[in-house]
Design a protein with these regions (language model features):
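Twin-arginine (Tat) signal peptide motif
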Residues: 33-42
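Boundary at the C-terminal end of the N-terminal hydrophobic targeting segment
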Residues: 55-59
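Extreme N-terminal basic, low-complexity initiation segments
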Residues: 2-11
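Cell-envelope and extracellular/periplasmic
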Residues: 60-304
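Bacterial N-terminal signal peptides
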Residues: 41-53
């Protein structure tokens, strides 16, 4: 049986002025021995044990003892990776899916997964992880490493960029506990200009190669998704929005770097702004990412 994430219980104080704590206060003197004092002593002992348990209980969710059983996935890109979907009110996180939170602690994968902006919401990472968990042995837990930041260009994710460094720092923490199994990427809206779009494919391929070199894994599976097909053709200032060109550039990735796959966005809807996928679309998108990841992993698995 897989252990359920632990929950920390907080106890509200009963008095505005705290009583002396017999567990920690050296000045506390025991009462004369009597039935009443014996009962008080028993209650005090139970209180001490409770306080000790609360004090030593970790805020971090339980993780597998073997790194091989903790499959990690790095989530990078901009807002459509971070997620802007409406968060369901009745969340029931998968018992074998965790996220590395903003405090760099493992926690149940409730949404929002990301914390880049207050508007972070439902994301494709949730259904991706649930699909991967369903296909994995019961001993395996999926660990998500959310690093996406809305509104960011590819340049900030390239080698030695600020977001490159932040993602690698969080990845290093996560890899102390598990094994990286793949990287998920969704970005390009910020690069859909006449100056940036034509070189997007080459720059993305270079970023993937540099990232793999940095993490010492030249065949790490990398899955990228298309931008939404609902994006407007021109920006409010009248300049063309070259999202179609970005998608064409993304399509060149598998021919430029090995062990890469592309996920289409056809048929997926937006949340009303013609920019961000809605929750239903993100759920489907995440499943598509998982299917692409599984194909890459199967293709790169050693022959038996």
């Amino acid at each position: 049986m897989v252990p359920q994430p632990s929950r920390i219980v907080s106890i509200a104080p009963l008095h505005a002025t705290p009583w002396p704590n017999p567990c920690t206060d050296p000045t506390h003197k025991p009462m004369h021995v009597s039935l009443r004092s014996s009962l008080l002593s028993l209650a005090t002992s139970l209180l001490c044990l409770t306080q000790l348990g609360l004090a030593t209980a970790s805020a971090q969710a339980p993780i597998p003892t073997r790194k091989e059983d903790f499959h990690l996935y790095l989530l990078i890109g901009q807002s459509n990776m971070a997620g802007r979907g409406a968060v369901p009110p009745d969340q029931k996180p998968h018992p074998r899916v965790l996220k590395l939170d903003k405090e760099n602690k493992w926690a149940p994968a409730t949404e929002p997964l990301h914390f880049d902006k207050p508007i972070a919401g439902a994301a494709l990472g949730t259904s991706f992880a649930e699909t991967m968990a369903a296909a994995a042995p019961e001993s395996v837990t999926i660990g998500l490493i959310p690093c996406a930041v809305g509104g960011t260009p590819l340049s900030r994710w390239e080698k030695d960029g600020d977001l490159w460094k932040q993602a690698l720092a969080r990845l290093e923490i996560a890899r102390q506990h598990g094994t990286l199994k793949g990287i998920l990427w969704h970005q390009g809206e910020a690069d859909s200009t006449s100056t940036l779009a034509p070189t997007y494919g080459k720059r993305l391929a270079a970023m993937v190669s540099d990232l793999r070199t940095q993490i010492l894994s030249p065949t790490m599976p990398f899955v990228a998704g298309h931008l939404g097909t609902f994006i407007v053709e021109s920006n409010p200032n009248g300049t063309p929005n070259l999202w179609r060109k970005i998608n064409d550039e993304i399509d060149t990735l598998p021919s430029n770097v090995p062990h890469a796959a592309i996920v289409p966005s056809e048929g997926l809807g937006h949340k009303g702004d013609r920019l961000h996928f809605d929750t239903a679309a993100l759920r489907e998108f995440g499943k598509r990412y998982a299917e692409a990841m599984q194909r890459l992993q199967k293709a790169s698995a050693p022959a038996r």
